[in-house]
Design a protein with these regions (language model features):
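Active-site beta->alpha loop and helix N-cap motifs at the rims of alpha/beta catalytic domains
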Residues: 3-5, 9-13, 19-22, 27-104, ...
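Conserved anion-binding
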Residues: 56-58, 97, 104-105, 109-141
Length: 141
């Protein structure tokens, strides 16, 4: 089992990377905006994260697109940032279709917002390399 750091904060990523135990990073535009980032700079920020963690550490960057074609287009752009970028896609019907398309192109996908075992199975069947399970989130509200 591997655990990934879920943040957009470069200082947190640098600190975790210095421990030598960082398995990966996941982030999204919402986390980036919480540290003062602007959506227009998100791709550049992903590049900075990739530079910090190095090429052997996967960095999951989330697409905010909502349709299959938009997610695929955004996913291709994200994947072009660095070889260790994993496209993070919400577990929804359009996301499953986009995951299959990207996986068929050899682009790694992390399906997020995965709440149930059946969703995880669907994600795997669609070609996702990773899932980001949300456990206990409803209890936190």
């Amino acid at each position: 089992m591997k655990f990934f750091l879920d943040t957009a904060d470069l200082a947190e990523i640098e600190e975790a990377a210095s421990w030598g135990a960082l398995a990966g990073v996941t982030t999204n535009p919402t986390l980036y905006s919480r540290i003062g980032g602007k959506l227009d700079d998100f791709h550049a920020h992903i590049k900075r994260i990739c530079d910090i963690v190095g090429p052997d550490c996967p960095v999951s960057a989330e697409s905010v697109a909502m349709t299959r074609d938009e997610i695929v287009r955004d996913g291709r752009e994200l994947a072009a940032i660095a070889p260790n970028v994993v496209v993070k896609i919400p577990t929804m019907v359009e996301g499953l279709a986009a995951t299959r398309a990207l996986a068929d192109e050899g682009i790694p996908v992390n399906m997020t917002l995965c709440f149930t075992v059946p969703q995880a199975i669907l994600a795997a069947r669609a070609g996702a390399r990773y899932i980001s399970p949300f456990v206990g989130r409803f209890d936190d509200i």
